[in-house]
A protein has these predicted regions:
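ADP-ribosyltransferase catalytic core
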Residues: 181-261
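Short peripheral tails and domain-boundary helices/loops at the edges of structured domains
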Residues: 128-130, 261-267
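N-terminal signal peptide
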Residues: 7-48, 287-294
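C-terminal GPI-anchoring signal of eukaryotic secretory precursors
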Residues: 264-281
Length: 294
């Protein structure tokens, strides 16, 4: 974990924070919903420990060369440390969910930096075209792993609902599909427990979603008032209803499980041993020294 610590210590200049929303206006495009076959959808089953040990090597190819990622991460580290010092709820949320600090910072970086989450999801949607594409052209392996693990840890925390009823608004794109169809978002999809929040992001398509694999991330979001629920790219949904309202589409989706083309793609194809117990805290200990959180 040494390189991870060094990268975080280095720091980067601050830049302005922009609200996370899509650009409004322009012609509406139609895009058909599908199973997002090119999405990188790894769930890292049975390789959590190996993947965590690979993070220092991955940092050399992601944190250092790609300044936007490093800058967003550095700002998230600073903001999380400041939040934890003034807001006991942040500390309680971290301990209550057993969320590793690295995962908390990944969630914060994802929600606070407009350029990062857009560029990241653009890459996630295409990095699954081949394993070679993932290995050599996908420069967000660390962020993908940490977000995936964060959602899993949050969902396993005591008191988290099994399924959540959420909304997602999209501007400028009218999605099409048919009732009964199985689909995936194919990216980390931001949704909200509040319908009015989704409408702020757009109304060209409004998704009303019952998710059973998304997690409530409000305690780790830069915008907690949005009551965000983040859905992983591998969750599948059944289209239950589609309604057209003028130029806008209203689509109901119900969780139908998960589907992944990849598992532990960073490692050669072979049987992987189960992760040993006691991994939780390895990244936490390293990052706590940097952020000054308890």
């Amino acid at each position: 974990m040494e390189l991870l610590v060094l990268v975080l210590l280095a720091g980067t200049p601050a830049s302005s924070i922009h609200p996370r929303r899509w650009e409004r206006g322009g012609a509406i495009r139609e895009i058909a919903l599908d199973m997002a076959p090119n999405s990188f959808d790894d769930q890292y089953r049975r390789c959590h420990f190996r993947m965590a040990r690979a993070l220092p090597a991955l940092n050399r190819t992601e944190f250092v060369p790609y300044g936007d990622f490093a800058e967003a991460w550095s700002k998230a580290v600073e903001h999380w440390g400041s939040r934890a010092r003034r807001d006991s709820r942040a500390c309680r949320a971290q301990r209550g969910s057993q969320l590793q600090l690295a995962q908390a910072i990944a969630l914060l970086a994802y929600t606070m930096e407009e350029g990062l989450y857009q560029e990241f999801n653009k890459a996630v949607r295409t990095a699954g075209r081949s394993r070679r594409e993932y290995l050599h052209a996908f420069h967000f392996k660390v962020l993908h792993f940490l977000l995936t693990e964060a959602l899993r840890d949050l969902r396993s925390a005591q008191g988290h609902p099994r399924c959540l009823h959420v909304y997602r608004g999209v501007d400028g794109i009218r999605f099409t599909g048919r009732p009964g169809q199985l689909v995936r978002f194919g990216q980390f999809a931001s949704t909200s427990l509040l319908k009015n929040v989704s409408q702020y992001y757009g109304t060209s398509t409004t998704f009303e979603v019952d998710t059973c694999h998304g997690a409530d991330i409000r305690d780790f979001s830069y915008y907690p008032e949005e009551e965000e629920v983040l859905i992983p790219p591998f969750e599948t949904f059944r289209v239950t209803n589609i309604t057209l309202r003028g130029d806008d589409a209203y689509i109901h989706l119900r969780s139908h499980g998960v589907h992944s083309k990849y598992n532990c793609a960073w490692f050669p194809g072979r049987s992987l041993p189960r992760d040993p117990p006691g991994l939780t805290g390895l990244l936490l200990a390293a990052l706590a020294a940097v952020t000054g959180t308890p």
